[in-house]
Amino acid sequence: MPGYNHVNRLVSELGEIGTKTQYLFTIGLVLTTIISIFFNIGLFRICKKNGLNIIPILILWTFSFSVLGAGIFPYPLRLHGLLGSPSIILFLSPLAALVFWKNTVIAHIKVISLLTLIIMMLGFLVFLPDFFSNYLGLKQ
């Protein structure tokens, strides 16, 4: 897409209706959904095997759902935003891991969960319009 810049433009603009990259973007999102489903299934099995609570994994399913919705309904359709929005609770997954996985056999999972939570919380900068206002893509 000519003139596109990841720093100041929305990622969804790559899949916007009528762009040359629309179908490539959609295929990428659908493939991402499929891969994330297999990833979630694997994590679910690991949790069951190690006796870990599955709530953090169930929250991860919001990502799969959101990416699929954003891919099937391209920007600027209303459903693009609506079906893409469940991923806003994705940050709850590492938070739930910190709460529910207190005693685990998986080394360093609490540290990794905390670091992941901190990084994911940076995504909420997108809701502060005056903070880095020219860098919407970077905040996203």
Regions found by a protein language model. Name each.
Residues 27-39, 89-99:
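Hydrophobic cores of alpha-helical transmembrane segments in multi-pass inner/ER membrane proteins
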Residues 104-140:
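Terminal transmembrane helical module of multi-pass membrane proteins
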Residues 14-34:
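Interfacial helix-start motif at the membrane-water boundary
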Residues 57-71, 118-122:
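Small-polar-interrupted transmembrane alpha-helices in polytopic inner-membrane proteins
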Residues 1-5:
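Alpha-helical transmembrane segments of multi-pass membrane proteins
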Residues 42-55, 100-112:
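Membrane-interface helix-boundary motifs at transmembrane edges
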Residues 6-7, 73-83, 130-140:
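Interfacial helix-loop-helix junctions of multi-pass membrane proteins
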Residues 63-105:
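Membrane-proximal helix-loop-helix units in multi-pass membrane proteins
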